[in-house]
Swiss-Prot record:
Cofactor binding note: Binds 1 zinc ion per subunit.
Catalytic activity: 7-aminomethyl-7-carbaguanine + guanosine(34) in tRNA = 7-aminomethyl-7-carbaguanosine(34) in tRNA + guanine
InterPro entries, A to Z: ArchSynthase1/Queuine_TRR (IPR050076), TGT (IPR004803), TGT-like_sf (IPR036511), tRNA_ribo_trans-like (IPR002616)
Organism from which the protein derives: Serratia proteamaculans (strain 568)
Functional note: Catalyzes the base-exchange of a guanine (G) residue with the queuine precursor 7-aminomethyl-7-deazaguanine (PreQ1) at position 34 (anticodon wobble position) in tRNAs with GU(N) anticodons (tRNA-Asp, -Asn, -His and -Tyr). Catalysis occurs through a double-displacement mechanism. The nucleophile active site attacks the C1' of nucleotide 34 to detach the guanine base from the RNA, forming a covalent enzyme-RNA intermediate. The proton acceptor active site deprotonates the incoming PreQ1, allowing a nucleophilic attack on the C1' of the ribose to form the product.
Active site: D89, D264
GO BP: any one term: tRNA wobble guanine modification
Lineage: Bacteria, Pseudomonadati, Pseudomonadota, Gammaproteobacteria, Enterobacterales
Name of the featured protein: Queuine tRNA-ribosyltransferase
Binding site for substrate: D89, S90, G91, G92, F93, D143, Q187, G214
Gene: tgt
Keyword annotations: Glycosyltransferase, Metal-binding, Queuosine biosynthesis, Transferase, tRNA processing, Zinc
Top-level taxonomic group: Bacteria
Record's keyword annotation contains Hydrolase: no
Enzyme Commission no: 2.4.2.29
């Protein structure tokens, strides 16, 4: 993987990630394909929304169907028939989400398989081996996602273990002679001094890109913005920056303003299945009765298949009838909305007009523009 930085506007960056499998224009949003599929969508449909890279979930794919099944096909790209780049998370976040079902030790994490109850062990080395078999274009190190709230002492010990695991991830990745990219993950909770130690430690180890982890886990938005403003300038300028698990459209805008290049989140797909649809001026809850006789498109500014062909009344009808097509059409729209937002941000950065774009964006959804600290 190669990262090219074209231009900047304030802290925002316009560039691209270059892989053997294709080019990803940045800032970029990655749809989430947890089980090797973006729910309800074919790879061709996902591509038509404008997505150039997907996220796959190491933890879930390892437990089901397993590495060996995917290796029968080649790798994850061949298994799911997505021929563009794929980033896979390390499995750390899912393991730590298991709560009482897992035990964290220096060597790794022991836990019960949530599918069948079997005892399972996942370590930095094992995560690197799984992601190697998946053929991931971007491999994520195995880390502990520090929960929120966490006091300083816990956040410190968690961050320090993540740094040790980062070194072990790097070593096993290199032993496998993996020619793809490996990203480090910056931890430290909401504590700037701990984030400083994490960034320095990861940069000293050396990675192809750097993710900001442990945000969007319940902390106030002000804390997320503060940590991004503190951390991003410390990441080498020639490396991509990835904000994990984020987020709402305004979170993408705020991340870009602070120097983030890559995002992923289940929100556009999950919300689509629940009838919450993102439009230029906010959110449409298509389940509401007021849409039952509305012949207008979901979003007059949107060029997606759904908005070109169907009315709000039809989408309301499908949702109320719990029709599968409704979830599919909603997902097509939400993913296209996110990709249109990213394209708008990229164009605004190119033209040096990002803050005008931001003001217009917030004006349309009726919210004030969050301040940028110097």
């Amino acid at each position: 993987m190669k990262y090219e930085l074209d231009t900047t506007d304030g802290r925002a960056r316009r560039g691209r990630l270059i892989f053997e499998r294709g080019v990803v224009e940045t800032p970029a949003f990655m749809p989430v394909g947890t089980y090797g599929t973006v729910k309800g969508m074919t790879p061709e449909e996902v591509k038509e929304t404008g997505a150039q890279i997907l996220l796959g979930n190491t933890f879930h794919l390892w437990l089901r169907p397993g590495q060996e099944i995917m290796k029968l096909h080649g790798d994850l790209h061949d298994f799911m028939q997505w021929h563009g780049p794929i980033l896979t998370d390390s499995g750390g976040f899912q393991v730590f989400s298991l709560g009482a079902m897992r035990k964290i030790k220096e060597e790794g994490v022991h836990f019960r398989n949530p599918i069948n109850g079997d005892k399972v062990f996942l370590s930095p080395e094992k995560s690197m081996e799984i992601q190697y078999d998946l053929g991931s274009d971007i491999v994520m190190i195995f880390d502990e996602c520090t929960p929120y709230p966490a006091d300083w002492d816990y956040a410190k010990s968690s961050m320090e273990m993540s740094l040790r695991w980062a070194q072990r991830s790097r070593q096993r990745f290199d032993e496998l002679n993996n020619k793809n990219a490996l990203f480090g993950i910056i931890q430290g909770g909401v504590y700037e001094d701990l984030r400083d130690v994490s960034v320095k430690g990861l940069v000293d180890i050396g990675f192809d890109g750097y993710a900001v982890g442990g945000l969007a886990v319940g902390e106030p938005k002000e804390d997320m913005h503060r940590i991004l403003e503190h951390v991003c300038p410390q990441i080498p300028e020639d490396k991509p920056r990835y904000l994990m698990g984020v987020g709402k459209p305004e979170d993408l805008v705020e991340g870009v303003r602070r120097g983030i290049d890559m995002f992923d989140c289940v929100m556009p797909t999950r919300n689509a299945r629940n009838g919450h649809l993102f439009v230029t001026d906010g959110v449409v809850k298509i389940r509401n009765a007021k849409h039952k006789d509305d012949t207008s498109p979901l979003d007059k500014d949107c060029d997606c298949y759904t908005c070109r062909n169907y009315s709000r009344a039809y989408l309301h009808h499908l949702d109320r009838c719990n029709e599968i097509l409704g979830a599919r059409l909603n997902t097509i729209h939400n993913l296209r909305h996110y990709q249109r937002l990213m394209a708008g941000l990229r164009e605004a950065i190119e033209q040096g007009k990002l803050e005008l774009f931001v003001a217009d964006f917030y004006g349309r959804i009726g919210k004030p523009v969050p301040p940028l600290n110097a």
